[in-house]
Amino acid sequence: MAGRSEEDQQLLQAIQIIKILYQSNPCPTPAGSRNARKNRRRRWRRRQAQVDSLATRILATVVHGSQDNNLVDLPPLEQLNIRDPEADRLPGTGTVDPGTKDN
C-alpha cells in the first residue's frame, strides 16, 4: 500500500472539514448569570444543529456522491461559517406580529 486512493483522500478531507466545523463551536462557558448561561446554551444548541446538518450533508456527498436534486446550492466550503443570526440584529428590530394587540 504505497498510497491512498482518491476516494480515501476525499473521505479524509471531508472528515477533517467536519472536525474543524465541530471545533469551531465549543461548548459555552459556565460563567455568568443563570439567564446568560441559559441563552448561551440555547444559541450553542442552535449552532450545533447547523453543524450537525452541514456535517451530514458533507459526509453524504462524499459517501453517496452529489445529489442532482439539491434545492439549494452550497457555496464553496471555504466560504461557509457559523454565526448567530440573532446577534446581527439591532436591539428593537425584532419582528412584530400584527395579529396581536397591545393592552
From Swiss-Prot:
Q: Where is this motif: Nuclear export signal and binding to XPO1?
A: 72-83
Query: What Pfam families does its record include?
Result: REV
Q: Which GO terms describe its molecular function?
A: DNA-binding transcription factor activity; RNA binding
Q: Has keyword Transcription?
A: no
Q: Where is this region: Homomultimerization?
A: 17-25
**Where would you say this protein principally sits, based on its record?**
host cell
Spell out the residue ranges making up region: Disordered.
24-49, 82-103
Which InterPro entries does this one have? REV_protein (IPR000625)
Please provide, in alphabetical order, the Gene Ontology terms of the cellular component aspect for this entry. host cell cytoplasm; host cell nucleolus
**What is the residue range of the motif Nuclear localization signal and RNA-binding (RRE)?**
33-49
Q: Which residues cross the membrane?
A: none
Q: Which domain of life is it from?
A: Viruses
Biased segments, Basic residues type: 35-48
* Maturation and modification: Asymmetrically arginine dimethylated at one site by host PRMT6. Methylation impairs the RNA-binding activity and export of viral RNA from the nucleus to the cytoplasm. Phosphorylated by protein kinase CK2. Presence of, and maybe binding to the N-terminus of the regulatory beta subunit of CK2 is necessary for CK2-mediated Rev's phosphorylation.
| HAMAP family per record | REV_HIV1 (MF_04077)
Q: What else is known?
A: HIV-1 lineages are divided in three main groups, M (for Major), O (for Outlier), and N (for New, or Non-M, Non-O). The vast majority of strains found worldwide belong to the group M. Group O seems to be endemic to and largely confined to Cameroon and neighboring countries in West Central Africa, where these viruses represent a small minority of HIV-1 strains. The group N is represented by a limited number of isolates from Cameroonian persons. The group M is further subdivided in 9 clades or subtypes (A to D, F to H, J and K).
Q: How does it assemble?
A: Homomultimer; when bound to the RRE. Multimeric assembly is essential for activity and may involve XPO1. Binds to human KPNB1, XPO1, TNPO1, RANBP5 and IPO7. Interacts with the viral Integrase. Interacts with human KHDRBS1. Interacts with human NAP1; this interaction decreases Rev multimerization and stimulates its activity. Interacts with human DEAD-box helicases DDX3 and DDX24; these interactions may serve for viral RNA export to the cytoplasm and packaging, respectively.
Q: What is known of its domains?
A: The RNA-binding motif binds to the RRE, a 240 bp stem-and-loop structure present in incompletely spliced viral pre-mRNAs. This region also contains the NLS which mediates nuclear localization via KPNB1 binding and, when the N-terminal sequence is present, nucleolar targeting. These overlapping functions prevent Rev bound to RRE from undesirable return to the nucleus. When Rev binds the RRE, the NLS becomes masked while the NES remains accessible. The leucine-rich NES mediates binding to human XPO1.
Similarity remark: Belongs to the HIV-1 REV protein family.
Q: What name is this protein filed under? A: Protein Rev
Q: Which organism is it from?
A: Human immunodeficiency virus type 1 group O (isolate MVP5180) (HIV-1)
Lineage, opening ranks: Viruses, Riboviria, Pararnavirae, Artverviricota, Revtraviricetes
